[in-house]
């Protein structure tokens, strides 16, 4: 059972659901964090932090910040629409739904009741080649707003965040019904008129949007005539968790918002480390970013009120890092509670920072550890146990500490180096160029053994004649 497997969909069905849910979630933000994401990747959180923050606000020639109308910025709104359409989804208009509530020029729907008017949601459809509606996607936006009204909308959403934690009983549970009760009825009617059932609906969202996903799941049995009781619910970075198994709650262990509430209850741990496992949550996925890696940043306590920790919360980091888990060759071996370290370092930090399990601000990690590299040139270090390491693309350097690791190299993986390889390790080559006979690929070069697959290679540093066991190499 894979780490993101959902209900009885099986692995491939669950992967498709995850990809759809992520595409819808990212679209709901309209690329709002594009400037920060690009600035962070180029400049990091160290000496380049000022440039990262400038990029977040003003963008650059290759990104759009949160301030609209900067002439040298690309149109990230257009890019967001193109991305969700490429994933197979198209926004459904208010007129098609017969809905008379507030909607903006982009087709985003706004909350209906007083106190919820800054909530936002997207409604999308997936169609076959003949134009027949196959599925409906509902994407709740997290705390933020369109660039033009970002400050006022964010303040309204922050009030909702506080009320969910500290306000009236069941505020979080009832949130989706209060904010979008009328719209969701129209969507249910529209779906039914096109021959769809709740099973054909994907509900997704991030942060406050993830809270809305859990809320809608909680309400689904008795609201909207029960239409959504069998819908598919995937929430990212939600502070709350719905009771039961309707929702798959996905998040980074070091995201201060994810699981901040116990169910929907606030307690003292909500303000600090909150790593309690829940039935519906992924509990041990780490975003190995500049903040997590830095001893200096971690002098300050881990807390939802410590703003630097929020780098682990941004939607772009979810889209990139979580998708690499989904596409990993180790996916089938990962369970809901596996320890998974995802490389999300900036370019400056990646050059001299070893990606590894620091087990920071969390309960002790147990069992095998999976480390997933990026498309850049990563430095990856295994621990003392049995690790599963996939460097990804780029020219990676991998340090082996235990001698009981499995290294996976897939497709065009670059020119990698393994330091400390031992015969008890396992090398797995998947979808690589050439034959499946190790003798066609292995050659001793000086004091090293080099395995070459077309333009890609792995150098086993310090491993000469007799140091490589054929039993420990799989080529497929």
Curated annotation (Swiss-Prot):
Molecular functions per Gene Ontology: calcium ion binding; triacylglycerol lipase activity
Highest taxon of the lineage: Bacteria
Catalysis performed (reactions): a triacylglycerol + H2O = a diacylglycerol + a fatty acid + H(+)
EC number: 3.1.1.3
Signal peptide residue numbers: 1-23
Keyword field: Calcium, Hydrolase, Lipid degradation, Lipid metabolism, Metal-binding, Repeat, Signal
Broadest EC class assigned to this enzyme: hydrolase
Protein name (database record): Lipase
Organism in which the protein naturally occurs: Pseudomonas fluorescens
């Amino acid at each position: 059972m894979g780490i993101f497997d959902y209900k009885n969909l099986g692995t491939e069905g669950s992967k498709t659901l995850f990809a759809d849910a992520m595409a819808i979630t990212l679209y709901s933000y309209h690329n709002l964090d594009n400037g920060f994401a690009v600035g962070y990747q180029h400049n990091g959180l160290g000496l380049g932090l000022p440039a990262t923050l400038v990029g977040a606000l003003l963008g650059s020639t290759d990104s759009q910040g949160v301030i609209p109308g900067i002439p040298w910025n690309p149109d990230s709104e257009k890019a967001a629409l193109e991305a969700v359409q490429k994933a197979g989804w198209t926004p459904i208009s208010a007129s098609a739904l017969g809905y008379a509530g507030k909607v903006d020029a982009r087709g985003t729907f706004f909350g209906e009741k007083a106190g919820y008017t800054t909530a936002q949601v997207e409604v999308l459809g997936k169609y076959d080649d003949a134009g027949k509606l196959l599925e409906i996607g509902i994407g709740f936006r997290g705390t933020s707003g369109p660039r033009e009204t970002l400050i006022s909308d964010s303040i309204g959403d922050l009030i909702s965040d506080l009320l969910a934690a500290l306000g009236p009983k069941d505020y979080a549970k009832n949130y989706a019904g209060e904010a979008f009760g009328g719209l969701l009825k129209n969507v249910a009617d529209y779906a039914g008129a096109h021959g769809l059932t709740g099973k054909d609906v994907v509900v997704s969202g991030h942060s406050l949007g993830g809270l809305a996903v859990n809320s809608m799941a909680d309400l689904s049995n008795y609201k909207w005539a029960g239409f959504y009781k069998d819908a598919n619910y995937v929430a990212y970075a939600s502070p709350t968790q719905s009771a039961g198994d309707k929702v798959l709650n996905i998040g980074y262990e070091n995201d201060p918002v994810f699981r901040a509430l116990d169910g929907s209850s606030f307690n003292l741990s909500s303000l600090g480390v909150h790593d309690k496992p829940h039935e519906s949550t992924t509990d041990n996925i780490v975003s190995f970013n500049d903040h997590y890696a830095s001893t200096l940043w971690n002098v300050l306590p881990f807390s939802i009120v410590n703003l630097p920790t929020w780098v682990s919360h941004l939607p772009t980091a979810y889209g990139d890092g979580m998708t690499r888990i989904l596409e990993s060759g180790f996916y089938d071996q990962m369970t809901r509670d596996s320890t998974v370290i995802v490389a999300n370092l900036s370019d400056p930090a990646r050059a001299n920072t070893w990606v590894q399990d620091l087990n920071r601000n969390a309960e002790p990690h147990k069992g095998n550890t999976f480390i997933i590299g990026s498309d850049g040139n990563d430095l990856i270090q295994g621990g003392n146990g049995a690790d599963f390491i996939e460097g990804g693309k780029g020219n990676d350097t991998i340090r082996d500490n235990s001698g009981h690791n499995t290294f996976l190299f897939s497709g065009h993986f670059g020119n990698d180096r393994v330091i400390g390889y031992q015969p008890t390790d396992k090398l797995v080559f998947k979808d690589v160029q050439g034959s499946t006979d190790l003798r066609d690929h292995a050659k001793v070069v000086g004091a090293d053994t080099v395995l070459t697959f077309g333009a890609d290679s792995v150098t086993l540093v310090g491993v000469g004649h007799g140091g490589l066991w054929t039993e420990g190499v799989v080529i497929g």
